[in-house]
Swiss-Prot record:
PROSITE patterns reported in the protein's UniProt record: DHFR_1 (PS00075), DHFR_2 (PS51330)
Lineage, highest ranks first: Bacteria, Pseudomonadati, Pseudomonadota, Gammaproteobacteria, Enterobacterales
Gene: dhfrXV
Catalytic activity: (6S)-5,6,7,8-tetrahydrofolate + NADP(+) = 7,8-dihydrofolate + NADPH + H(+)
Domain of life from the UniProt record: Bacteria
Membrane-traversing stretches: none
Gene3D superfamilies: Dihydrofolate Reductase, subunit A
InterPro entries reported in the protein's UniProt record: DHFR, DHFR-like_dom_sf, DHFR_CS, DHFR_dom
The protein's name: Dihydrofolate reductase type 15
Length: 157
């Protein structure tokens, strides 16, 4: 099973402030919507609760709480390992989509990073882990918006 990771990261490494993303760069979320369309997303409970279930996506939500969901497109797991073990029986690709603890736990296990770097330095309390030296950028595109950003694809190896 291929594991990809998608994140929007500010210049100072912030990815969240409590349950919120501390910016709104017009157009950047369209990248997320396009890349994750019809895909399985692996997320933590807090991230899932802040983003909600987007249409045409399936979710594996990892939580230590008693969180449940009646949505047929949402599966809940008590650990990342249990989620991955189940997902590999039903799909060949999963996109790790946050939050901070999930990113930190899986960044060394993913094959591809989809990173939007947002040209802002907000306050926040959730940070993206350092990108391992085993990754190399293979694509980059800059976008001019209300808050400028760049989108990069990084591959392991």
């Amino acid at each position: 099973m291929k594991l990809s990771l998608m994140a929007a990261i500010s210049k100072n490494g912030v990815i969240g402030n409590g349950p919120d993303i501390p910016w709104s760069a017009k157009g950047e979320q369209l990248l997320f919507k396009a890349i994750t369309y019809n895909q399985w997303l692996l997320v933590g409970r807090k991230t899932f609760e802040s983003m909600g279930a987007l249409p045409n996506r399936k979710y594996a939500v990892v939580t230590r709480s008693s969180f449940t969901s009646s949505d047929e497109n949402v599966l809940v797991f008590p650990s990342i390992d249990e989620a991955l073990n189940h997902l590999k029986t039903i799909t060949d690709h999963v996109i790790v989509s946050g939050g901070g603890e999930i990113y930190k736990s899986l960044i060394d296990k993913v094959d591809t990073l989809h990173i939007s770097t947002i040209d802002i330095e907000p306050e926040g309390d959730v940070y993206f882990p350092e990108i391992p030296s085993s990754f190399r950028p293979v694509f980059s595109q800059d976008f001019v918006s209300n808050i400028n950003y760049s989108y990069q694809i990084w591959q392991k190896g």
